[in-house]
């Protein structure tokens, strides 16, 4: 799960990158089914990227973020965030620990 961007994305290996994404997609239902009430899972990355771009540098894409689990709204839209710290603030609020910055969007993704 961790290395497919450096092995395929930054190497412009579109087919290898696609294969790894398909493997991850196949594993998601197993991860989600292991969640208990009150849990949620956040999928994200440190940057967006287009493995078909000629450059091996980061490209223009936004950072992806998907949340899943019991009590999470399917298709919740948190819009474009100004900082990645918002993900940390959201997780911190859910865990009831102090946030180091950012603005939580927990209320936008959890059902009542």
What is each stretch, according to the model?
Residues 1-112:
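Feature captures the catalytic ectodomains and active-site-proximal regions of enzymes
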